[in-house]
Amino acid sequence: MKTLLLTLVVVTIVCLDFGHTLICYNDHGYIGKTTETCENGMTTCYEERWREARGTRIERGCGCYKVKPGVQMNCCKTDRCNG
């Protein structure tokens, strides 16, 4: 009986995902700001801003990457921090 209980505990621990998945605002263009759950292992959100003829564009999502000059990139590491 103890062996069965121990086996159930081990299986439960292995099957559960103890990692926290990050939630970022997602805004790609003119659709509007929503949220997305980032893939496992992704630890940053971004907000990217640049100017166009029609005004300032803002894009948001999961991740953080290098951008070209003239683009402002802000990266952060907490849920909904890129709003």
From Swiss-Prot:
Belongs to the three-finger toxin family. Short-chain subfamily. Type I alpha-neurotoxin sub-subfamily. GO terms for cellular component: extracellular region. It is found in: Secreted. Binds to muscle nicotinic acetylcholine receptor (nAChR) and inhibit acetylcholine from binding to the receptor, thereby impairing neuromuscular transmission. This is Three-finger toxin MALT0052C. Disulfide bonds join C24-C45, C38-C62, C64-C75, C76-C81. The keyword NAD does not apply. Expressed by the venom gland. GO terms for molecular function: acetylcholine receptor inhibitor activity; ion channel regulator activity; toxin activity. The keyword Disulfide bond applies. Keywords: Acetylcholine receptor inhibiting toxin, Disulfide bond, Ion channel impairing toxin, Neurotoxin, Postsynaptic neurotoxin, Secreted, Signal, Toxin. Residues 1-21 form the signal peptide. InterPro entries: Snake_3FTx, Snake_toxin-like_sf, Toxin_cobra-type.
